Amino acid sequence: SGYTYRQDLAEMSLGLAFAAFSSKDSEYEDQLATSNRNFISFAEQCGFENIRSNKWMTQPAETDSIGINCASKTIRDNGGQYTLIAVGVRGNNYHAEWGGNARLGASGEHAGFAMGRDQVLDYLRAYIAETGITGRVKLWISGYSRSASVANMVGGMLDDGCSLGARVSLSPHDLYCYCYEPPMGATKDEVQGRVYENIHNIVNTNDLVTYVAFDSWDFARYGVDRVVPTKGDANYLN
C-alpha cells in the first residue's frame, strides 16, 4: 500500500526524481532534444515502456512551464493486473522556470506550483489516453525541490478524488508519492483534518527551500513529513 513508507522505494524514488532532471548537456540550447535522456535510460533499465516526455523537456523553458516524464508497464500484484505508471517531474536544470517559483499569487495556494500541478495532471491524462491504458493503475510519482511541491500537490488532488479519466481507476492505496525537499504550495485549510498518508515528504530541516512558502502565511504540505537526521539531533551518531 502507498500508505506504508518503504525505504527501498524511497531510494528508488529519489533516482526517479533525479532522472527527471534535464541532462547536463541540455544547458546548451542545441542539446535540448536529448535533455530527457537520463529519464529514458532510467525507465528502460527498470523495464518500463511507452516512455514519453512533454514538450518542455525538449524546448526552452518558460516561466510557468514544467518538464514531465512518463513511462508504464504491466505488473501483477495481489493476484490482479495493473498498469504501473511512473511520473518523474523535472526539479533541476529548468532555467526560466525559476520565475514560477516566485509566483505566489494574491491568496490561496502557491500559484506557480499549482500551474505545474495542473500541467502534470493534464499531461498524465493525455498520456493514459494516447497509450491506451485502461483498468486499474498504480501511480508512482516523484519530484525534487520545485517539482517535489508539484508532485505533492498532484498527490493531494488525486487523494481528493481528481480523475485521471473514465477508463482507469486509481485507489489511494495504489498512489506512491515521494517528494524530496518540497516547498509548501498548498494551504493549511486544504490539508488539515484529512488523511494524505500516501504522500511522503523527505525533508532536511537545514534546507531553506522546505520553509517556503512560509508557514506564517498559512502555506502547508500534503502528506507526512519524514525528517532526515541532522547533527542537531541528540541521537545523531546513533
Regions found by a protein language model. Give the residues of each.
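Gly/Ala-rich beta-loop-alpha elbow adjacent to hydrolase catalytic centers
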Residues: G143-S147, A151
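A conserved cap/lid and substrate-binding interface adjacent to the catalytic center
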Residues: I40-S142, M157-D174, G193-Y196
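N-terminal low-complexity, Ser/Thr- and acidic-residue-enriched intrinsically disordered segments
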Residues: S1-P60
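Short, polar loop/linker segments at the starts of domains and inter-domain junctions
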Residues: D30-T34, A102-E109, R221
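The feature captures the conserved acid-bearing segment of alpha/beta-hydrolase catalytic domains
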Residues: R167-N238
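Short, hydrophobic alpha-helix immediately C-terminal to the catalytic nucleophile
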Residues: N152-G156
